[in-house]
């Protein structure tokens, strides 16, 4: 069972991890929320380092860049490829072909710049409030969302791909275990506060369904790039709602 954790850490992070990979890569999906917690914990440490010198802007930059370096930019690359393929390809085949191109186009560049700036602004607000649990929650929920997408949508490429080994055997057991783990970790990180936990969970679900709907419409399934983009967009959505919660917007609406 721990071999699944090894595979999950090697897949989602650049951390040097000893041990053997799982025989079935899909077994690593059970561990995605836990790896999200590891990533979130490291990102939080970087944010705390920036706040330790009283510099929220530095804290947000360290958290953002640290997350990118820790994940080798894997999810960000998926976001760029998704934007290029979905908005640059007029047909399913064209979209899949563009997504496989290692070069980043104009749509991909715009998506990366926009989402990274957006995340930096949210992280700045969260760092100022020292809402470290909410920062980590974004990392946990975004990796949990990847499992849900992999378990409920077919793989789009007939010629295989890097994510096919994870998606082809994914099913309800992976979805249920990851969902329960992700929700429990969310509540723990937010000190069992019901209202903010439900709001962040709502944001992650909306972003997840949006990515799933768009991917189904454009290519009829998912790829590794879609899973990476899902992680980036869910994380951004969670951090946005966390920042809005801290600014009291939901109380103002109520």
Curated annotation (Swiss-Prot):
It catalyses: alpha-ribazole + adenosylcob(III)inamide-GDP = adenosylcob(III)alamin + GMP + H(+); alpha-ribazole 5'-phosphate + adenosylcob(III)inamide-GDP = adenosylcob(III)alamin 5'-phosphate + GMP + H(+). Pathway: Cofactor biosynthesis; adenosylcobalamin biosynthesis; adenosylcobalamin from cob(II)yrinate a,c-diamide: step 7/7. Its cofactor is Mg(2+). It is found in: Cell inner membrane. The chain crosses the membrane at residues 27-47, 50-70, 104-124, 131-151, 170-190, 194-214, 233-253. InterPro entries: CobS. It holds the Pfam family CobS. GO terms for cellular component: plasma membrane. Keywords: Cell inner membrane, Cell membrane, Cobalamin biosynthesis, Magnesium, Membrane, Transferase, Transmembrane, Transmembrane helix. Its EC number is 2.7.8.26. It is a multi-pass membrane protein. One of its GO terms (molecular function) is adenosylcobinamide-GDP ribazoletransferase activity. It comes from the Bacteria. HAMAP family: CobS. Joins adenosylcobinamide-GDP and alpha-ribazole to generate adenosylcobalamin (Ado-cobalamin). Also synthesizes adenosylcobalamin 5'-phosphate from adenosylcobinamide-GDP and alpha-ribazole 5'-phosphate. NCBIfam families: cobS. Belongs to the CobS family. This is Adenosylcobinamide-GDP ribazoletransferase. It comes from Chlorobaculum tepidum (strain ATCC 49652 / DSM 12025 / NBRC 103806 / TLS) (Chlorobium tepidum). The gene is cobS.
């Amino acid at each position: 069972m721990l071999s699944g954790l090894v595979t999950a850490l090697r897949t989602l992070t650049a951390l040097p991890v000893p041990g053997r990979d799982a025989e079935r890569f899909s077994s690593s999906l059970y561990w995605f929320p836990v790896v999200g917690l590891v990533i979130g914990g490291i990102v939080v440490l970087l944010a705390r380092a920036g706040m330790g010198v009283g510099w929220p802007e530095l804290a947000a930059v360290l958290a953002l860049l640290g997350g990118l370096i820790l994940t080798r930019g894997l999810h960000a690359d998926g976001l760029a490829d998704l934007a290029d393929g979905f908005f640059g390809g007029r047909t399913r085949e064209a979209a899949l072909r563009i997504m496989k191109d290692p070069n980043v186009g104009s749509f991909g560049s715009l998506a990366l710049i926009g989402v990274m700036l957006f995340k930096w602004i949210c992280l700045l607000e969260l760092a100022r409030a020292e809402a470290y649990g909410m920062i980590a929650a974004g990392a946990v929920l975004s990796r949990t969302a990847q499992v849900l997408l992999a378990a409920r949508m077919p793989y789009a490429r007939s010629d295989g791909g890097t994510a096919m080994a994870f998606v082809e055997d994914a099913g309800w057991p992976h979805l249920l275990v990851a969902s329960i783990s992700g929700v429990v970790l969310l509540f723990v990180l937010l000190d069992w506060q019901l209202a903010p936990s439900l709001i962040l969970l709502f944001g992650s679900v909306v972003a997840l369904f949006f990515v799933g709907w768009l991917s189904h419409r454009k290519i009829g399934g998912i790829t590794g790039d879609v899973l990476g983009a899902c992680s980036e967009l869910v994380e951004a959505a969670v951090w946005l709602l966390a920042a809005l919660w801290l600014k009291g917007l939901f109380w103002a609406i109520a």
